[in-house]
């Protein structure tokens, strides 16, 4: 069963404080029968849109509405080296319709460089074959430079990353990484993994675009559908039969 664990943290980038809400979803795909296991996650994302919309429509609106909308989904792929699981394809299809999705290969150090590149290529093909929308995608308002940058990132997807909370001393220098049989994996060395490229993409070059895309594409689509449904429900004529039943 999918659970939701929310962690709020503050990071500092170039002297600017950035508050992040991180939502983990332990339990996804862990059951024997995983049919419709994506529904709680999809519902959670839509619920955050609903909360924001209700606050937006209140008579006395807050000056700064607390924003709990999900601006990006980091979808971690098991480093099997083979292909996406059917459950992952279904999940990505559902998520790609309602939020920015960035696919990531987790624990990429378990693959050789050749295996990693072959796996990335297969995943990109599967995303395309299944018409799965992942971030970044081109927009008609983008200029040539923005389109070129997007093309470079799209060719790199899914990001192959290695994570670690440990810092080692290597030749007198602190190195965040993982110790393996082949030696030290430095997660901030671009020749070892793509963590640095992913971090820069997520928190520096594309942070504001992720927020804008959520607001003007996904949330606006949700908002329009909700307001249209509200308008249609309020405009429905009252059934004459229903009125007669109440009169009697």
Please annotate each region the language model reported:
Residues 107-109:
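Short beta-alpha junction loops
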Residues 241-248:
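Conserved small/polar residues in nucleotide/adenosyl-binding loops
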Residues 17, 67, 176-179, 242:
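Intrinsically disordered, low-complexity sequence elements enriched in Ser/Thr/Gly/Pro
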Residues 232-240:
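C-terminal regions of RecA-like/P-loop NTPase motor modules
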Residues 1-99, 112-134, 138-141, 145, ...:
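Switch- and interface-adjacent substructures of P-loop NTPase systems
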Residues 100-105:
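Short hydrophobic alpha-helical runs that function as membrane-insertion/retention elements
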Residues 157-186, 194-197:
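Conserved P-loop NTPase
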């Amino acid at each position: 069963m999918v659970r939701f664990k929310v962690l709020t943290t503050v990071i500092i980038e170039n002297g600017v404080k950035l508050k992040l809400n991180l939502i983990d979803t332990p339990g996804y795909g862990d059951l024997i029968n995983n049919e419709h296991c994506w529904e709680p996650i999809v519902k959670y994302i839509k619920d955050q849109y609903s909360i924001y919309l209700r606050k937006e429509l209140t008579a006395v609106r807050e000056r700064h509405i607390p924003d709990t909308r999900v601006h990006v989904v980091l979808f971690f792929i098991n480093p099997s080296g083979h292909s996406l699981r059917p459950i992952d394809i279904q999940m990505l299809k559902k998520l790609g319709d309602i939020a920015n999705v960035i696919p990531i290969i987790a624990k990429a150090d378990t693959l050789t460089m050749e295996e990693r590149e072959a796996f990335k290529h297969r995943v990109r093909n599967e995303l395309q074959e299944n018409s799965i929308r992942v971030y970044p995608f081109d927009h008609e308002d983008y200029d040539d430079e923005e389109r070129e940058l997007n093309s470079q990132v799209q060719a790199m997807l899914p990001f192959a990353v290695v994570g670690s909370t440990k810092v080692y001393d290597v030749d007198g220098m602190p190195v965040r990484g993982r110790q393996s049989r082949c030696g030290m994996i430095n997660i901030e060395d671009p020749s070892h993994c793509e963590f640095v490229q992913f971090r820069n993409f997520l928190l520096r070059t594309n942070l504001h675009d992720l927020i804008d895309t959520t607001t003007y594409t996904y949330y606006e689509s949700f908002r329009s559908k909700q307001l249209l449904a509200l308008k249609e429900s309020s405009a429905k004529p009252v059934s004459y039969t229903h009125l007669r039943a109440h009169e009697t």
